[in-house]
């Protein structure tokens, strides 16, 4: 992967904390939902309820598509990422604790709220590993996309 593109991807991942992730429902229809995420390099983590539709969908098929972007008043300032990726349940307790710590770092305001953080036993934590990343940057031209295979 080109180092300039890698830096751009990491910058976009680091400056955002919400993504839209699409999983496949049992009937074959995609289901897109918004989730908070944290990343360590190109690896993303998110959590959901253990009995959620996302968790059930991913238990059947670990393929996901996701987008990370933001609203902008100028069309030519649109930037973002879309990915084809695999999402696996984090089963290692050390990695699960790390993922929860990373998520808390994305939401520092949460520390002042007197609600307990969920434990790995309370939620399903997923590790998202990108296979293909599309880097959208309209400042390089309308609809400009750099495609990266991981």
Predicted region positions:
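Extreme N-terminal tail/first-helix region
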Residues: 1-18, 146-147
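Short gly/ser/thr-rich secondary-structure transition/capping motifs
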Residues: 3, 47-49, 109-110
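Alpha-helix boundary recognition
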Residues: 13-14, 59-60, 104
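Short beta-strand segments
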Residues: 17-50, 58, 65-70, 78-80
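Short beta-strand segments in beta-sandwich/barrel cores
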Residues: 19, 44, 64, 87-88, ...
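Charged, gly/pro-rich active-site loop segments
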Residues: 75-150
